[in-house]
Amino acid sequence: MKSYFVSPVAYILLFSCSLINGASFVFWLNYLSINNIKEFTLLQACMNAFFFWFLLLVQVPVLTMRSFAEEYKLGTIEMILTAPVREWELVLSKFLGSVCFFSVLWMPMALYLAVLRIVYGHSLGMSAGMIVLPFLMLLLIGMFFISIGLFVSSLTKNQIIAAILSFALIFLIFSLSFLIYLGIGGQTREMISYLSFLDQMDTFSRGIFDSRPVVLLGSATFFFLFLTEKILEWRRLRE
């Protein structure tokens, strides 16, 4: 995680994330209070807004593009792979470092909400579940996207290519969320709804816990980390 804080990209991400989330927070707070809207909470509005998802889709590829691509470019991957470190340990360390920094990026949003909770108390209209569960879903989605970013970064030594391919793959998977609006019904609609990040976030932001997305995202994250480990194992054998 230390490597993130010596990179200017990290501070750009932190600044942009804080700025966009802060602006979104202020906008929705004013909008909901002025129009006296009670149908959804402040956190629901923020976490279902366009800029929330745009920021999430863009920041993860930028966050993970250096993970292995830079090691390939600098030639340090050979030294790492010949060290007494197993591939899964390397993948896990990169993954946990990225997840920790990802959490730091979104921490200001939690702080904004904490301040409002202190000032307004229960009049804010949000239970503990409505506050904790959306951030849990955000973390799960972030972990899944990060695992994709690490996998793509392990395939190339060009950081820009890693970022572009990661974004393309993440966006493709995210686009499945919009299939539900094509008028599909029956079991197909139910399956798409189960795979939809938008529906999952909406459910959790209402304070409703559903174990299915947790299992799905956890399994998908493990799958991409497993693929990354196999890529590194193949590179070790090739050396």
Over which residues does each language-model region extend?
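Membrane-embedded or membrane-proximal helical elements that form or frame transporter/channel pores
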Residues: N30-T64
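Short helix-to-coil transition segments within interhelical loops
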Residues: M79-E87
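Hydrophobic alpha-helical transmembrane segments of multi-pass membrane transport/permease proteins
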Residues: V6-N30, F51-V60, A168-F174
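Secretory targeting signals
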Residues: G22-V26, L42-A45, F51, L55, ...
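Hydrophobic/aromatic residues in alpha-helical transmembrane segments
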Residues: V60-T64, Y112, S147-I148, L227-T228
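A short amphipathic helical element positioned immediately N-terminal to and/or at the very start
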Residues: M1-Y4
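Transmembrane helix boundary and interhelical loop/hinge segments in multi-pass membrane proteins
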Residues: P61-M79, F95
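Terminal transmembrane helical anchor/hairpin motif
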Residues: W28-L43, A162-I231
